């Protein structure tokens, strides 16, 4: 029996709509992985939600003149619509402002505190001299004191990868208004990472099959590991569940302490919503289960250090020892899958500067398939990559429409025109060319599978598209349009078209994790019925998940919100050759993919930003 697969996907901030750079990093790769695993018959749980705490929401709410909760409600709904429209097959996409989430986060904090891994310390906190507001780490920039790189943030230098304290930055300034922050003494709880360093290091050393950049980064930050503050001077977030702190409205848990717990709380919420409250344990306390975490490279440290450290401390596995918490033996990540950045015509995506393409606009103009294809074949898997309209149009027209779409269209069209059905070739001989193409397609199942299993999504789709190219070359060489004119060649025509139809079917299986919307259409074009690739749906739910753990300052009960969920177990999609059945009725097909106007290659649609 295969291991259960937990697919944990980074939580997007609910401070605005998502742009295509966001979904290139966490969205499409995770869905390709989850869909493939389901096709292998494995038990998959894919979870995420909107991250609704932290200063970015406070700042945006102030700009829009609404409360933080109103802002979160608005963008939770928008993000849910965007991600569902892209076909991301979450079992549950929820949010961090639920009663269940608060209670689970506080359970981890109190257990870490009881086990001695939360230590109280006086630190220097940054405030804005003009407003008196606390400035969070990520809203302070300056020169890195370690490597000298400009633009280092108050929590981390992206150039050298080291964690930082805001007070350590050279020539620090506020990203909000450009003023020099004032540093004052404040009391916080810090996660004692040095006490967990040996356990973290031992675990990381066992992760040799990770992407090299992720493993190297994660090991490097262990070299100078320090305690890290897990509380903040802020009035929006999860309350600190300790006497003297819980009723202090200006002390909350650090957004990244609570965000990573979201994978666990979402799994627990999902279990309650399906009516099996203990179902989550199959993926979380089962040593045989495997867990994969998908995110952009700027979030590696929170998933390869902070979250594993929280789980180790919760289980009492650091140098201070301790007692395992009520939720049990939480299992560490199997792999942290990080993507690099997607830029636009050489510029970093920036909503404030207007250099942005929102998912909602893209879906409205082009639908999900072209975006999913571009991200899969040209996305930022191992290095930063650039989105240009020229490259997008070229990929869509030459590869998606002309190569894959044309193979489907001409194969089914010729079979429908000449036979009206899948031709029967029983008793007929296949040539070496026929067998070579069929063998290539069948062998490619294992090749693509190995690539997806090891998070090499670009290599996987390239292998599938190689078969598409070989199938087009086969049709060009066999010239079925000429065979159709010679009655003596009718048997040969049947073999050629049957072979081509089988390979179209094979390619559709190979491409289903990448292009599920198109895969359903191809399934039907081949004369098949039923649901091949299941799609997510949006539900409006009530915040009524039973809170079985003690919690303080929980959100109001009974609020409604939108989630993404779905029923994926009944889909027909399976990772194997599905034999073409002779006699299946075929009709003249409709184009699966639209060719785009070449003029779009210049600057994109009218609504698109112009980047010089």
Curated annotation (Swiss-Prot):
Note on cofactor: Binds 1 zinc ion per subunit.
EC number assigned by the record: 6.1.1.10
GO cellular component, one term: cytosol
Main location class: cytoplasm
Motif placement: 'HIGH' region: 12-22
Aminoacyl-tRNA synthetase in keyword set: yes
Binding-site list for ATP: 351
Molecular function terms, GO-annotated: ATP binding; metal ion binding; methionine-tRNA ligase activity
Requisite cofactors: Zn(2+)
Reaction equation(s) it catalyzes: tRNA(Met) + L-methionine + ATP = L-methionyl-tRNA(Met) + AMP + diphosphate
Binding site for Zn(2+): 144, 147, 157, 160
Localization in the cell: Cytoplasm
PANTHER family, sorted: METHIONINE--TRNA LIGASE, METHIONINE--TRNA LIGASE, CYTOPLASMIC
Subunit structure: Monomer.
Family in the record: Belongs to the class-I aminoacyl-tRNA synthetase family. MetG type 1 subfamily.
Job of this protein: Is required not only for elongation of protein synthesis but also for the initiation of all mRNA translation through initiator tRNA(fMet) aminoacylation.
Name assigned to this protein: Methionine--tRNA ligase
Lineage: Bacteria, Bacillati, Actinomycetota, Actinomycetes, Mycobacteriales
């Amino acid at each position: 029996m295969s291991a259960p697969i937990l697919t944990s996907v980074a939580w997007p901030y609910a401070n605005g709509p998502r742009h295509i750079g966001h979904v290139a990093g966490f969205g499409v790769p995770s869905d390709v992985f989850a869909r493939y695993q389901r096709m292998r018959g494995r038990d998959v749980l894919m979870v995420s939600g909107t991250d609704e705490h932290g200063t970015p929401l406070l700042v945006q709410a102030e700009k829009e003149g609404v409360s933080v909760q109103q802002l979160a409600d608005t963008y939770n709904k928008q993000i849910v619509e965007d991600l569902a429209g892209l076909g991301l097959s979450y079992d549950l996409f929820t949010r961090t402002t639920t009663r269940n989430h608060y209670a689970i986060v506080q359970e981890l904090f109190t257990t870490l505190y009881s086990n001695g891994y939360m230590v109280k310390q006086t630190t220097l906190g940054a405030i804005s001299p003009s407003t008196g507001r606390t400035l969070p780490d990520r809203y302070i920039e300056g020169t890195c004191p370690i490597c000298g790189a400009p633009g280092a943030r108050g929590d981390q230098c992206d150039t050298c990868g080291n964690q930082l304290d805001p007070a350590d930055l050279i020539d620090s300034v506020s990203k909000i208004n450009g003023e020099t922050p004032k540093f004052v003494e404040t009391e916080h709880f810090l996660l004692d990472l040095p006490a967990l360093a040996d356990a973290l290091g031992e675990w990381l050393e066992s992760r040799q099959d990770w992407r090299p950049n992720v493993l190297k980064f994660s090991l490097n930050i262990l070299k100078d590991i320090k305690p890290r503050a897990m509380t903040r001077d802020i009035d929006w977030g999860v309350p600190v569940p300790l006497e003297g702190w819980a009723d202090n409205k200006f002390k909350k848990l650090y957004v990244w302490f609570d965000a990573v717990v979201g994978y666990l709380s979402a799994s627990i919420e999902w279990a309650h919503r399906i009516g099996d409250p203990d179902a989550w344990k199959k993926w979380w306390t089962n040593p045989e289960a495997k867990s994969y975490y998908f995110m952009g490279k700027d979030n590696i440290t929170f998933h390869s250090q902070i979250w594993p450290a929280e789980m180790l401390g919760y289980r009492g596995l650091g140098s201070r020892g301790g007692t395992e918490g009520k939720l049990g033996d939480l299992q560490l990540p199997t792999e942290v899958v990080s993507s690099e950045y997607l830029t636009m015509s050489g510029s970093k995506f920036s909503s404030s500067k207007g250099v942005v393409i929102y998912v909602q606009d893209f879906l409205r103009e082009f639908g999900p398939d072209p975006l999913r294809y571009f991200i899969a074949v040209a996305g930022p898997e191992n290095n930063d990559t650039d989105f240009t309209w020229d490259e997008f149009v070229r990929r869509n027209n030459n590869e998606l429409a002309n190569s894959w779409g044309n193979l489907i269209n001409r194969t089914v069209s010729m079979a429908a025109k000449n036979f009206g059905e899948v031709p029967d070739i029983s008793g007929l001989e296949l040539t070496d060319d026929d067998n070579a193409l069929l063998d290539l397609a069948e062998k490619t199942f294992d090749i693509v599978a190995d690539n997806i299993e090891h998070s090499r999504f670009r290599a996987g789709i390239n292998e599938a598209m190689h078969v598409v190219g070989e199938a087009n070359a086969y049709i060009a060489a066999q010239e079925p349009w000429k065979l159709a004119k010679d009655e003596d060649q009718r048997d040969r025509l049947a073999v050629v078209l049957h072979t081509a139809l089988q390979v179209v079917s094979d390619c559709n299986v190979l491409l289903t994790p990448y292009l599920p919307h198109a895969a359903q259409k191809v399934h039907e074009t081949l004369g098949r019925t039923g649901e091949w690739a299941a799609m997510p749906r949006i539900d409006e739910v009530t915040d009524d998940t039973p809170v079985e753990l003690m919690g303080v300052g929980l959100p109001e009960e009974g609020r409604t919100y939108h989630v993404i969920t779905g029923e994926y177990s009944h889909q027909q999609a399976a990772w194997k050759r599905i034999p073409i059945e002779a006699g299946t009725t075929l009709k003249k097909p409709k184009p699966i993919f639209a060719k785009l106007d070449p003029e779009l290659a210049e600057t994109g649609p009218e609504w698109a930003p112009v980047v010089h």
